[in-house]
UniProtKB/Swiss-Prot annotation:
GO terms for MF: 3'-5' exonuclease activity; nucleoside diphosphate kinase activity
Catalytic activity, EC: 3.1.-.-
Lineage, broadest ranks: Eukaryota, Metazoa, Chordata, Craniata, Vertebrata
Subunit and interaction comment: Component of the axonemal radial spoke complex 1 (RS1), at least composed of spoke head proteins RSPH1, RSPH3, RSPH9 and the cilia-specific component RSPH4A or sperm-specific component RSPH6A, spoke stalk proteins RSPH14, DNAJB13, DYDC1, ROPN1L and NME5, and the anchor protein IQUB. Interacts with IQUB.
Protein name according to UniProt: Nucleoside diphosphate kinase homolog 5
Location in the cell: Cell projection, Cilium; Cytoplasm, Cytoskeleton, Flagellum axoneme
Domain of life: Eukaryota
Family: Belongs to the NDK family.
Tissue: Specifically expressed in testis germinal cells.
Role played: Functions as part of axonemal radial spoke complexes that play an important part in the motility of sperm and cilia. Does not seem to have nucleoside diphosphate kinase (NDPK) activity. Confers protection from cell death by BAX and alters the cellular levels of several antioxidant enzymes including GPX5. May play a role in spermiogenesis by increasing the ability of late-stage spermatids to eliminate reactive oxygen species. Exhibits a 3'-5' exonuclease activity with a preference for single-stranded DNA, suggesting roles in DNA proofreading and repair.
Any one annotated GO CC term: radial spoke
Principal location class: other
Any one biological process term the GO annotation gives: cilium movement
Length: 212
């Protein structure tokens, strides 16, 4: 008897990764590990936070003994923030990082990133969002211009396609049959670009160069 299996579903998550100030010089090396681990680097920026900004970012740790040292450390130099995406991005990035305390990581998870690049409990080299809510908040903090939306999965993805993609695509294919262009693929691509219902309106602003 043949068993009909449902089609596989692809789940894509986003998480925030930070290369902390004391290992910024290892950025290229760490990005190579990230890419080889199946992540896509959706966005990346290098910036320096003020102590006040660091306090706002780590607001849930306010009042703890290490809080002043943490904000001083994180504002001591430029850091690199990245939005990472892949299947189970949040949990897999945390797994790559290893324990928060780099001294513990060196003993229990010697191949983890914090064991390799970190120094101790405070200077643990890298940051990763703990859960979906944290990832959403932290991405908005570091990338305020980014629209953080859940990526459609499973039935939600099918519903999205049927509602937002298929009507425009069918209209384009119908017009394609009427026009009968010499190069159908190029014609359809151009038509879809011109008739995209979600096409944004461009607003030109001066670009401010970051100091780092």
């Amino acid at each position: 008897m043949e068993i009909s299996m449902p089609p596989p579903q692809i789940y894509v998550e986003k998480t925030l990764a930070i290369i902390k100030p004391d290992i910024v010089d290892k950025e290229e090396e760490i990005q190579d590990i990230i890419l080889r681990s199946g992540f896509t680097i959706v966005q990346r920026r290098k910036l320096r936070l003020s102590p006040e900004q660091c306090s706002n970012f780590y607001v849930e740790k306010y009042g703890k003994m290490f809080f002043p040292n943490l904000t001083a450390y994180m504002s001591s130099g430029p850091l690199v923030a990245m939005i990472l995406a892949r299947h189970k991005a949040i949990s897999y990035w945390l797994e790559l990082l290893g324990p928060n305390n780099s001294l513990v990581a060196k003993e229990t998870h010697p191949d983890s990133l914090r064991a390799i690049y970190g120094t101790d409990d405070l200077r643990n080299a890298l940051h990763g969002s703990n859960d979906f809510a944290a990832a959403e908040r932290e991405i908005r903090f570091m990338f305020p211009e980014v629209i953080v939306e859940p990526i459609p999965i499973g039935q939600a993805a099918k519903d999205y396609l049927n509602l937002h993609i298929m009507p425009t695509l069918l209209e384009g294919l119908t017009e394609l049959c009427k026009q009968k262009p010499a190069d159908p693929l190029i014609w359809l691509a151009d038509w879809l670009l011109k008739n995209n219902p979600n096409k944004p309106k461009l607003c030109h602003h001066p670009i401010v160069e970051e100091p780092y």
